[in-house]
Amino acid sequence: MNKTELLHEGKAKKVFLTDNKDLVIQEFKDDATAFNNKKKGTIGNKGVVNNAISCKLFTYLAEHGVSTHFVEKLSDRDMLCKRLDIILVEVVVRNTAAGSLVRRYGFEEGFRLEDPIIELYLKDDDLDDPLMNESHAVALGLANYEELELLKEQAATINTLLKTFFAGRKLNLVDFKLEFGRHNGEILLGDEISPDTCRFWDLDTGEKMDKDRFRFDLGGVEDAYTEVQHRVLDLP
């Protein structure tokens, strides 16, 4: 499968058309951004690491009944995917208080939530991806109420599966972001699942092992990403 034309370039990936109108190639970059593109840099080998992790996790989710855009891994940086009409709603699932949940509501960082919190955000960098509810999403024409309920149900299912997966690898899945899209009338999980889109803390030490190391200049960014890759790919 060959790349024919650049369809879209985002902060972390490029998406290329192929000779099959239903399939695209997602190429992972080493570029890193934070705070809605206000901070920019690179993380060595990030594209390779995130592609490997995402391929493994999409395969795991598919084996447990979750419909995703993933088709196959093509190379170190390239993933073959079903072409999606992206729904401009970011679904965030929170298991432990961190990030904007702490800033917005005053939770103590690290507070374990009794039940996961599922949030919806408008996918719009110019507006700083604002928090919204279902009524906003419907009014904006992004999805209907039935579709939004499906997104939340899928997010809850994915959360249960991933929490179990990562706990077995001594990682606390603090929170994570999901994106979905439409493909031939079906809603599929898209984008990626990686230290770019998830917060991971070591279960024993609480050490941050995700893009927060880049956001807040904690150092050891490449080592943290590589360690997550090791635990995801190499541990049973």
From Swiss-Prot:
SUPFAM superfamilies: SAICAR synthase-like (SSF56104). Pfam families: SAICAR_synt. One of its GO terms (molecular function) is ATP binding. It is an enzyme of class 6 (ligase). Its EC number is 6.3.2.6. The keyword Nucleotide-binding applies. Keywords: ATP-binding, Ligase, Nucleotide-binding, Purine biosynthesis. One of its GO terms (biological process) is cobalamin biosynthetic process. InterPro entries: SAICAR_synt/ADE2_N, SAICAR_synt_PurC, SAICAR_synth, SAICAR_synthetase, SAICAR_synthetase_CS. The keyword ATP-binding applies. It catalyses: 5-amino-1-(5-phospho-D-ribosyl)imidazole-4-carboxylate + L-aspartate + ATP = (2S)-2-[5-amino-1-(5-phospho-beta-D-ribosyl)imidazole-4-carboxamido]succinate + ADP + phosphate + 2 H(+). Pathway: Purine metabolism; IMP biosynthesis via de novo pathway; 5-amino-1-(5-phospho-D-ribosyl)imidazole-4-carboxamide from 5-amino-1-(5-phospho-D-ribosyl)imidazole-4-carboxylate: step 1/2. PROSITE patterns: SAICAR_SYNTHETASE_1, SAICAR_SYNTHETASE_2. Belongs to the SAICAR synthetase family. This is Phosphoribosylaminoimidazole-succinocarboxamide synthase. It comes from Chlorobium phaeobacteroides (strain BS1).
